[in-house]
Amino acid sequence: MNTTSEVIVGTGFQAIRQQLAQMHPELNFVEQLWLAYYKWFDNDVVATGLMSFLLHELIYFGRCIPWMIIDAMPYFRRWKIQPKKVPTLAEQWECTRLVLLSHFTVELPQIWLFDPMCATFGLSTSVPFPPVTKMIWQITLFFFLEDTWHYWAHRLFHYGIFYRFIHKVHHRYSAPFGLSAEYAHPLEIILLGAGTVFVPLMWCYFTHDLHLVTMYIWITLRLFQAVDSHAGYDFPWSLNKFLPIWAGADHHDYHHMAFKDNFSSSFRWWDAVLKTDQNYHQFKARRLAAKYEAESKKAK
């Protein structure tokens, strides 16, 4: 929808939204807010950059806070994958400091370049938004493509100088926790993060069919996945219990504990096909056998 010729009276956000609502009654409330936001700023670089950065911070730390609360509650230890390694407040604070430093020094400059990248690759910011069904299948595709990128890039980071000088930073915590999802070397943040950002951008470049709001929903879900896979808990209601191909915290926690194998981000099949999960399955079998043996002795 082209609204560049519309005359808006007043500069307040609410006044702009109300006028646009009268001009475009066919738009839903969220679409009206979206349009009013861009009209209010009247600067797409600032509007998109600010929204992108705030979205990232709110989603990332907002998702981490529940896991911090869970870590502080002994009741949940029964589902902690490494129950003897609960992060201390000092560890979480130290992790938060480095994560915030990387957000403001590494990610913020990239985020402020996001609107020019959107324009270059052809992302739409107009209203109305695309149908929900289109968003769902595009985001599903991005999950599969990002998982492929992540597997191979992550596996590369476990070789020689790539691990010693870059990826070793992320492996500081052998028992990961939610906040540690983005505790990483700047080069790792850029290269692994490329799967999240540039996969959709390249899709848009070749298809000319992607909306910024779809991109935001995708990034939100990807942040949820990253934080949850580092949280260190495997609940009976975890997604991998209902979707067996989903990796989840159980899959990634072993990677941090053993410093090898299980290189995928969201799914399990790359590790299964290339047999980089064999040690993981052997470890789980030994742990299960030890559990049964302990229960048998207790029953006697």
Curated annotation (Swiss-Prot):
Transmembrane segments: 186-206
Needed co-factor(s): Fe cation
Major subcellular location class: endoplasmic reticulum
Endpoints of the signal sequence: none
Stated induction or repression of this protein's expression: Expression is highly up-regulated under low oxygen and low sterol conditions in a sre1- and scp1-dependent manner.
UniProt topology in membrane: Single-pass membrane protein
Keywords noted in UniProt: Endoplasmic reticulum, Iron, Lipid biosynthesis, Lipid metabolism, Membrane, NAD, Oxidoreductase, Steroid biosynthesis, Steroid metabolism, Sterol biosynthesis, Sterol metabolism, Transmembrane, Transmembrane helix
Residue span of motif Histidine box-2: 167-171
Assembly information from the UniProt record: Heterotetramer of erg25, erg26, erg27 and erg28. Erg28 acts as a scaffold to tether erg27 and other 4,4-demethylation-related enzymes, forming a demethylation enzyme complex, in the endoplasmic reticulum.
Function: The third module or late pathway involves the ergosterol synthesis itself through consecutive reactions that mainly occur in the endoplasmic reticulum (ER) membrane.
Name of protein: C-4 methylsterol oxidase erg25
